[in-house]
Amino acid sequence: DGSLVVNRPDALRNFNEKVSISLFPHVTPKTLISCAEKELRGFIAKQDKTVVKPLDGMGGKSIFIIDKNDLNTRSILEAVTSDFTKTIMAQTYVPEITAGDKRIHIVNGKHCEVLLARIPSETDHRGNLVMGAKPEVQPLSDRDKEICNTIAPTLVENGILFAGIDVIGDFLTEINITSPTGMREIDKYHQYSVSAILFNQLEKILNEK
């Protein structure tokens, strides 16, 4: 009995929102998680462009794009890794970010029918609303649904009732379980209501207890 906890507490510990995508390598971009300079520079050298970001960041903070021959590479890595003492994520750059960083909500193992694309501004590469990205509600593509259906059983198995995944192009980039934002924007710009689906599901679970 007692209160209903949305997303099991041990899932908050076990599912780092960036690292957890490594459970699904067939639907993610090429990715390296490391703090070692040699490993990071070796990975960057094999990509045309690389995105680097901290594992505990949010809102697009401290996310950088590094070109293969960028003379600022070491300086950027020093800053993001705190002089190679802090583990970060490096991913091959997905050019479809210009069409939007797609937030898709999954409620109790089922994806919602629309997503929120956060389209970067002309002056910033980051698809975050707080960084000036433009919100646009869109239907899910077949690939979006495939990604959702791939990860949904793992979410349910680990007690994650509500998640907001990030998809760029055809690739999963994050699984957000502490701050799966975007509901309010979808509710505002579209007749489809993610919040109604979530609370209907919560009510159903409570009634079954």
Task: Show the residue positions of the predicted features.
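Anionic group-transfer/hydrolysis microenvironments
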Residues: P9, L55, Y93-V94, H105, ...
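Short glycine-enriched loops at secondary-structure junctions
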Residues: P9-R13, R118-P120, I168-F171
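ATP-dependent carboxylate activation and anion-phosphoryl transfer catalytic cores
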Residues: P139-K209
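Conserved N-proximal alpha/beta basic substrate-recognition cap immediately N-terminal to
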Residues: D1-G42
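Phosphate-binding site of ATP-dependent enzymes
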Residues: E37-K38, A45-K49, D56-K145, L155
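Short glycine/proline- and charge-enriched loop/turn segments
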Residues: P25, L129-K134, S179-T181
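Hydrophobic beta-strand scaffold residues
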Residues: V5, T50-V51
